[in-house]
Amino acid sequence: GFSFDTQGFSHACRLWTLTLEIAVLMAQFPSRQIALLSHTYRTLGLGYANLGVLLMDRGLPYDSEAGRAYAAAVTALMHGEAYAQSARVAAAIGPFPGHARNAEPMLRVIDKHRQHAHMIDASYVPKDLLRSAHDVWDEAYTLGAQHGYRNSQVTVLAPTGTIGFMMDCDTTGIEPDIAL
């Protein structure tokens, strides 16, 4: 097995959130309406692959409390880092254009994510991973309350498809590995 590189994962989440934010400016969209909505709400799609292999390597059954808690901690860290980074970008260049009319409900949703990150069962998750998830959600909430967010949505959990195979993934999203 290996230890989860919490600092490296957090750094990658911040870096890719910024990269995806920049890509919104350069992206080609299939229709005018999708382009308009993408620029108004600045939705991103940060995600991960190989969760099933991560759990298998840790010796955690996929359909278990331990597996769900570990997956929740990794997901909370990724999602929280992305929103904290989005709030940092908003502090520098402003929130997404549709933020003003969505600020209050969005902050309530962010707070719900923050609260749920603090409810992850600590008995199954490495302390540094869980502490980082807690801290970053507190930061994402605080920064967002001060500056808003640059992006209305930041993450997506979907199969990575063929790119997952190019990254040498055994699983392409959150599904379990089908065989050893």
Question: Which ranges hold each PLM region?
Answer:
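Long, C-terminal-biased catalytic regions of enzyme "large/alpha" subunits
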Residues: G1-L180
